[in-house]
From Swiss-Prot:
The gene is nhr-49. Induction: Exposure to low oxygen environment (0.5% oxygen) triggers hypoxia-dependent responses. A zinc finger (NR C4-type) spans 11-31, 47-71. Belongs to the nuclear hormone receptor family. This is Nuclear hormone receptor family member nhr-49. It comes from the Eukaryota.
Amino acid sequence: MDYFLDASKHIQLNQIDEESSDDFMDLVDPLAEPCAVCGDKSTGTHYGVISCNGCKGFFRRTVLRDQKFTCRFNKRCVIDKNFRCACRYCRFQKCVQVGMKREAIQFERDPVGSPTSGASLNGTPFKKDRSPGYENGNSNGVGSNGMGQENMRTVPQSSSVIDALMEMEARVNQEMCNRYRRSQIFANGSGGSNGNDTDIQQGSDSGASAFAPPNRPCTTEVDLNEISRTTLLLMVEWAKTINPFMDLSMEDKIILLKNYAPQHLILMPAFRSPDTTRVCLFNNTYMTRDNNTDLNGFAAFKTSNITPRVLDEIVWPMRQLQMREQEFVCLKALAFLHPEAKGLSNSSQIMIRDARNRVLKALYAFILDQMPDDAPTRYGNILLLAPALKALTQLLIENMTLTKFFGLAEVDSLLSEFILDDINDHSTAPVSLQQHLSSPTTLPTNGVSPLNPAGSVGSVSSVSGITPTGMLSATLAAPLAIHPLQSQDSILNSEQNNHML
């Protein structure tokens, strides 16, 4: 990476010899002008514009990879040194607006040139932003940057892991939207749509934009029931796409699901909440810090001491970090892939630990690629969300346990089977649930598993010939088709139980 320093505003990038750039070191102050894109400290003129290394590298990667971005908001995001990573679409547009030239990149040395020329980690100036293996996604390429073949495979493999996780997240989000739209049509009693349908049909490029902004407070048990059923059902389908979940024994599958379920119920709405004033739910409702006064007794008891802590301990750090969805899907996978979950067999622990390590590597490679200067700190701050998440999970379980123990209300059987019941109790794993967990996911996966890109996880299928024996099994046995099975919806609607957030 050459630091071309601006001796004159009339000197163009393609007129500077790479080997003579050091001649200007003593003539100009590289910090005289800030980066034209984000306002951070500049390191010279890059692609015709005074800019920092971060914006230079971002522009170069975007052009070389021909990446296309979308803005989650109104294409008017603020791009400064604090929030430049929040929206890649607006950042790239800012690069173009201030004068960065695509054609200037061709004057640099060919990024896929001889493997004997390239980046160095021994203090020598970098001649290229990335190695041949990175630019081409070729895991066999080895540059002269001192990195071995194993390390060179990290970036392309990590990118595949995150891409697959992102694809499955989008499919789950879309299915949530579809199920909510169907529930609204069913509630209206006519096949027509209501005023919210237009919002619900918005695309699901990201978890934050998959749902319309919430327009009413969550005030009824019906809202909580809908959220819990749909979220837990889709959690199972998502889990079946994560390698090596389908290779585990039935008992280990259920242990892993039970360990993760309460964390999932907290993570999903937390990521979609834009600020610390309210927790946004997928059915266009929200909960505020004092929203529990509008709920009935049991719902208020379950959420009163959880909602404020979710806002302070999960939502606030996410917003401070400007967490991207790529980071969020990795955080979800890390919470799910917990090899220390009580009761797991030794063989399952080994497989789960290997899968978790792949996600950890993918997350760090992504952060290092996008924000190299802040990578260690950002990586650590994301992982530090885990203790708060576990503490909130324990609080949620305690609330449910007290409710069930003192008979304050009937705890919903679906949540009870997922969160409260002992794994050694055979009633927690009825035959129908075992058959469902043994079947391929009903979500379309294109034959790709997030942690095993070359492996097939099965095609779209439905579970038939199963006689549900419990609330959980009845819910899980319902295939996630575009058109819901009326018989399964009837099973769900017939249960008059209570759910938590």
